[in-house]
């Protein structure tokens, strides 16, 4: 299976379906609830596409340059930017669109009811930041000591966890408040893309270096690190879009700006 064939079948087609569903929802007047409409959906989606492209490009080029993964030259067009084929850059754009449209689809179906009581929880934010930061330090230690089988995992977590830490520090309690929506946004796209990745690896479209990975295969095909890649990238996307669109995040940032202004006055 060529790389562009993979993109067409597993990303372009479901994106087209989600766009059609988005258009149908608009025609029927189905919208996001007010709590999740603090910013335009298209702006949040575009922002994440741009950030994903910029943030992933140097990291993925390093992976290919150091042989963590590579691709079958006969299954790509041959157009490359740096070390990475143009198809991979296309994936950088399509995955955020796919996951973002999926999340927005369920946002439009979210009932908008909130549990009563106080939802702000600084302790939750602090605990989660400490836990994830500890994971980042462990991943960094793997790279520092040069444990070769942990290379892919270490590079993956040291790259992905810092922005997740930032998201949790800002509003982990907001994400917890919308936890059902967040889980719905993360789990199905992760499982779907992992299954598609298994087919691509099985057909030889790209290869993961067994010497630089843990060699723990899900279903005998998919390296654990590949599953984790889709998990952490979808976490980044869903966390980010939820926080941008949630009214609570906007209110918190505004309150902190007012406090900073009052302190500085």
Summary of predicted features, one role per range:
Residues 1-265:
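Aromatic-rich, lipid-facing transmembrane alpha helices and their immediate juxtamembrane interface loops
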